[in-house]
Amino acid sequence: MRRFLLLGVALSALAGPIRVDVAQEKAGSEPVHFIPVVGNWLVVPEGGKNVLMVDGRQWKKGQPAGGLADKARLIYGSRHEEFIDNVKAFAYFPYAVAQGIEDFREGEISMRFQVVDGQLDQCAGILFKLKPNGDYLTVRFNGKEDNLVLWTFNKGKRSFVKRGTEDMPLAMKQWHSMKVAIKGTKLEGYLNGKLLLEYTLPEPVSGKVGVWSKTDSVSYYDDYTLNAAQ
């Protein structure tokens, strides 16, 4: 049974993986298929195709993305007010929400990423279990630490959950892969196909998904794909 929705349609009615792609979007513009909530997100050309970029060079603490009210309505409809209040109160880590994925519960989320720059941080991550109050989980890689880490965000407070079993230095300005697999409360995190992170969550996953960054990171994202549990 497929366990998440796309554009209001249960994925049980659709076959195969679902990609959230900006390849056909206009370079230099804000993305449509990912809704920026915090930070500066753009569609840029890279390697002959358009990809998603977070540009942290102008990052400022407490600065949500422009047009937040309209974007919150796209994400949560009539429930958007609480989301806006919490984003404004705790805008610190850049993230963008995948358009149309109503409720991811079980399966895999994968993407390619490329860390390009960053003086304070060099991060890219997969965001999931995003709630209307702004709480979420993220699995991220940080090139400043060479590790994969699971973090939880609750009422704007970031809390460390678990670090990967080993450090994995990754070359900058090259593509790498990240995957998060959820089965019930079991979570697995992979870098370049290698299992580095295993954790049992306190409760099942349910919520929206997206991409994540930190402070002044400049990173590219591509091939964002969801595979529902069968």
Regions found by a protein language model. Name each.
Residues 3-13:
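Sec-dependent N-terminal signal peptides
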Residues 58-154:
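Secretory/extracellular carbohydrate-interaction modules
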Residues 18-21, 204-230:
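Ligand-recognition surfaces built from glycine- and aromatic
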